[in-house]
């Protein structure tokens, strides 16, 4: 049985879906005002891997990941670029789709956009106002946190701790809010900003209400899994829970999952430190599969430390797996140990999707394969396990000229013409083909 570390309970829980054989997942997507950075990619890759493992286990997964296309940063960025907010968002949505495709990420079942759910957002806020979970103040609408009895549970803090932190922040809302923790459901329009008509005047939604509406509209009042980066625990996911459960009276999500951060040379990634790395830029020099494999080297909840050496190591290890995958099949080989590797892999992944341990099993399996255990069944299984990580190797086919040289070398060795055999080997090495003579014949790998 799959066990999930649930952030809400701070414990491993057996995964029991709402509907047998089906998984409904909502994962918070990007705010589309720039190219995604490597930290954003960690979340995308982590939850794509989780989705793929569910599917490997036979589940039907309804995977929803949104685009936040109404936001202060988008308004500011569009104005600076001399574009309308939709065209500006469209640009970075297209860039996002290209970047994650290069990382081998499967398309979501649906990628909802905020602008397509404005009527539903307004209706949601109206219900909260009618139930007195929200109040209007100067054209803004705020959620009344004092009525949410378990508000701080996901953040694992006391309400008093959060209030102290919120009261220390100075903003223009402080004088009109009943409580420093109250958060905006609807913001009144400022001059020149994109806005929509509402019962409270022209305005736009707050960030947190957007995800609650899209998640419940598509997946229903209660969903199986809600995921995102660890930075979203508070306030974003905390506020999602408060407003969603206030409206429906039901548990919003049964499992809360949060991935760890990506550090750069053991420092937090930030523009101020000059270590801000976008996937768009990284893909110019590093293959997408290498980036993805690097991100999978740690279990999703743990931080990943980005260094040039770590990425290089991922490239070397991936090349080893690729060369293993392209070894010649030996149908008469002994593959009785295969099921032991599969069982060990599944045990690793069932334990809260421990990709680090899962990859360790794959490398143990690769070592076993290289010792002469590569049947068609083994190759098919290796491909299935690698695909969970979004790694798909294409069958390598040698050019006819190279195949001819390998055959000529074999003939030279048979005739004990080792000078010719060595010359051909060196010539092939210059073309990136490395030969290995074994008791079962010659094997080749591509450097």
Curated annotation (Swiss-Prot):
Its main location: cytoplasm. Pfam families: CysS_C (PF23493), DALR_2 (PF09190), tRNA-synt_1e (PF01406). A motif ('KMSKS' region) lies at residues 268-272. Keywords: Aminoacyl-tRNA synthetase, ATP-binding, Cytoplasm, Ligase, Metal-binding, Nucleotide-binding, Protein biosynthesis, Zinc. One of its GO terms (cellular component) is cytosol. PANTHER family: CYSTEINE--TRNA LIGASE, CYTOPLASMIC (PTHR10890:SF3), CYSTEINYL-TRNA SYNTHETASE (PTHR10890). This is Cysteine--tRNA ligase. It comes from Streptococcus agalactiae serotype III (strain NEM316). The gene is cysS.
């Amino acid at each position: 049985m799959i066990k999930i570390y649930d952030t809400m309970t701070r414990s491993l829980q057996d995964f029991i879906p709402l509907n047998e054989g089906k998984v409904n997942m909502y994962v918070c997507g990007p705010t589309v005002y720039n190219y995604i950075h490597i930290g954003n990619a960690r979340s995308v890759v982590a939850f794509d891997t989780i989705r793929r493992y569910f599917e490997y286990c036979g589940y039907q997964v309804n995977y929803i990941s949104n685009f936040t296309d109404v936001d202060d940063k988008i308004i500011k960025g569009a104005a600076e670029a001399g574009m309308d907010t939709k065209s500006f968002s469209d640009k970075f949505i297209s860039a996002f789709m290209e970047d994650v495709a290069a990382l081998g990420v499967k398309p979501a079942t649906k990628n909802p956009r905020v602008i397509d759910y404005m009527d539903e957002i307004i209706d949601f806020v109206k219900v909260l106002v009618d139930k007195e979970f929200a109040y209007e103040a100067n054209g803004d609408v705020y959620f009344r946190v004092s009525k949410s009895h378990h508000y701080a549970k996901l953040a694992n803090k006391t309400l008093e701790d959060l209030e102290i932190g919120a009261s220390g922040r100075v903003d223009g809302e402080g004088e009109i809010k009943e409580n420093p923790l109250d958060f905006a459901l609807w913001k009144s329009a400022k001059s020149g900003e994109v806005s929509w008509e509402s019962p409270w005047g022209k305005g736009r939604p707050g960030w947190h209400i957007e995800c609650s509406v899209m998640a419940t509209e598509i997946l229903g009042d209660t969903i199986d899994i809600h995921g995102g980066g660890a930075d979203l625990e508070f306030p974003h996911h905390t506020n999602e829970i408060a407003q969603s459960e206030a409206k429906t009276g039901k548990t919003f999500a049964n499992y809360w999952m949060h991935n760890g951060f990506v550090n750069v040379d053991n420092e937090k990634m930030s523009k101020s430190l000059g270590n801000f790395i976008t996937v768009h830029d990284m893909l110019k020099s590093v293959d997408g599969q290498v980036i993805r494999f690097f991100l999978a080297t740690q279990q999703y909840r743990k931080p990943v430390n980005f260094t040039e050496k770590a990425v290089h190591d991922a490239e070397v290890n991936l090349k080893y797996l690729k060369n293993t995958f392209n070894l010649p099949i030996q149908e008469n080989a002994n593959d009785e140990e295969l099921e032991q590797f599969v069982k060990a892999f599944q045990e690793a992944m069932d334990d809260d999707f421990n990709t680090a341990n899962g990859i360790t099993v794959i490398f143990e399996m690769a070592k076993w394969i290289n010792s002469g255990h590569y049947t068609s069944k083994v190759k098919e299984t290796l491909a299935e396990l690698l695909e969970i990580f979004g790694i798909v190797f294409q069958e390598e086919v040698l050019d006819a000229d190279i195949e001819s040289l390998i055959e000529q070398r074999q003939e030279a060795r048979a005739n004990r013409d080792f000078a010719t055999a060595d010359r051909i080997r060196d010539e092939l090495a210059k073309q990136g083909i490395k030969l290995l003579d074994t008791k079962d014949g010659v094997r080749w790998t591509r450097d």
